Amino acid sequence: MAERVIITLACSVCKNRNYYFDRAKNHEGKLALKKFCKNCGKRTDHKETK
């Protein structure tokens, strides 16, 4: 079974870290989702950060 790691999703506009997820450590590539940013007040791209 793959080890899980905690990742943070940061807004690509204001760089505010809004969401936390866990995923398998052996996953390749960075996660990018369109989520709501409380700081910007709209849906923006959120990209994975450590």
Curated annotation (Swiss-Prot):
SUPFAM superfamilies: Zn-binding ribosomal proteins. GO terms for biological process: translation. Signal peptide: none annotated. Coiled coil: none annotated. GO terms for cellular component: cytoplasm; ribonucleoprotein complex; ribosome. The keyword Ribosomal protein applies. Pfam families: Ribosomal_L33 (PF00471). InterPro entries: Ribosomal_bL33 (IPR001705), Ribosomal_bL33_sf (IPR038584), Ribosomal_zn-bd (IPR011332). GO terms for molecular function: structural constituent of ribosome. Keywords: Ribonucleoprotein, Ribosomal protein. Disulfide bonds: none annotated. Belongs to the bacterial ribosomal protein bL33 family. NCBIfam families: PRK00504.1, rpmG_bact. This is Large ribosomal subunit protein bL33. The lineage of its organism: Bacteria, Pseudomonadati, Elusimicrobiota, Endomicrobiia, Endomicrobiales.
